[in-house]
């Protein structure tokens, strides 16, 4: 659920940053990166319709190659399909109602939505993508019924959810996940990576070690941008394009539940980027990025 943002004046500042990032993203097709595995489930999004090349999987390590044909739009990524499941005893409709709370303009309702999502659902990414920059998400899944859909583009926009049912059967193999970079999302609402210099074509292991859901968007910014400048921009309440914004493709992973690990393989241009999470704080409803959950990194 990309941009789990409050639709308030302050939040529009964040949209200005993300919107500039994707305005010219992925205008030309590119060859499939070498890390794309033909055995992975191919998840594609066109409009708000998500399709999957397979809907019955074996438990254990599974991979999903995520792409979109949606043109990049100011204010959001092109697509961010989410893999999720309700916990036992919670209906799918209840979990979708929780998501609607999370997208509320009212901070108290948004905070309630975060608490509800933490309680009622389990979230497993997937990816934030723009045309020409697919990503592959690899993770370990237990048997059960899952759903894939772009909740932000449907529930978040006041539209009915469009979902694909995924059935995971027993019998697969679970493998240890490793990547070029480890990045932890913490209970202090911070990103803690093993390094702030990443390969521009590589992989990271996203580990949610927090007590709440987090996602991580990777947004390009001008070289020399600092986290202090980004925080000052959020604090200012500005709604226009930030002075450090840069046109270019974005990447990242969608919402993950505490305790979940997923490997994301990506291919983005070299340069300076900022990691962002806009999930609403479960007490105040303030987006995590406004509270300091942003980190400038370099892709080389």
Task: Please describe what each predicted stretch is.
Residues 31-37:
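Cleaved targeting-peptide boundary
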Residues 40-41:
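Short, positively charged
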Residues 114-115:
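Preference for solvent-exposed, low-hydrophobicity sequence contexts
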Residues 190-195, 204:
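Short helix-to-loop capping/linker segments positioned immediately adjacent to catalytic or ligand/cofactor-binding
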Residues 1-31:
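Secretory targeting and sorting signals
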Residues 131, 234-259:
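Tryptophan-paired
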Residues 68-111, 201, 208-238:
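Contiguous segments within soluble domain cores/interaction surfaces
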Residues 35, 44-45, 49, 54-59, ...:
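Extracellular/periplasmic metallocenter environments
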């Amino acid at each position: 659920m990309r941009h789990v943002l409050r639709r308030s004046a302050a939040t529009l500042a964040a949209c200005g940053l993300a919107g500039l990032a994707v305005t010219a993203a992925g205008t030309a097709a590119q060859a499939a990166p070498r890390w794309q595995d033909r055995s992975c489930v191919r998840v594609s999004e066109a409009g708000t319709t998500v399709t999957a090349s397979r809907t019955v999987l074996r438990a254990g390590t599974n991979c999903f190659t995520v792409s979109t044909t949606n043109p990049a739009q100011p204010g959001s990524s092109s697509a961010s399909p989410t893999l999720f499941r309700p916990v036992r005893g919670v209906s799918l409709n209840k979990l979708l109602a929780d998501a609607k709370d999370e997208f509320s303009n009212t901070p108290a309702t948004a905070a309630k939505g975060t608490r509800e999502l933490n309680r009622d659902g389990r979230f497993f990414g997937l990816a934030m993508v723009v045309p020409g920059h697919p990503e592959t998400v690899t993770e370990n899944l237990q048997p059960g019924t899952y759903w894939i859909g772009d909740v932000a583009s449907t529930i978040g926009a006041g539209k009915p959810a469009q979902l694909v049912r995924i059935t995971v059967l027993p019998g697969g193999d679970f493998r240890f996940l490793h990547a070029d970079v480890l990045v932890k999302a913490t209970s202090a609402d911070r990103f803690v990576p093993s390094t702030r210099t990443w390969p521009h074509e590589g992989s990271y292991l996203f580990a949610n070690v927090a007590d709440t859901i987090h996602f991580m968007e990777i947004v390009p910014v001008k070289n020399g941008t600092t986290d202090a400048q980004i925080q000052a921009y959020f604090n200012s309440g500005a709604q226009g394009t930030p002075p450090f914004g840069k046109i270019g493709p974005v990447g990242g992973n969608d919402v993950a539940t505490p305790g979940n690990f997923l490997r994301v393989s990506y291919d983005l241009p070299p340069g300076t980027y900022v990691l962002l999470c806009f999930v609403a704080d479960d007490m105040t409803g303030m987006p995590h990025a406004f509270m300091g959950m942003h980190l400038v990194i370099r892709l080389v």
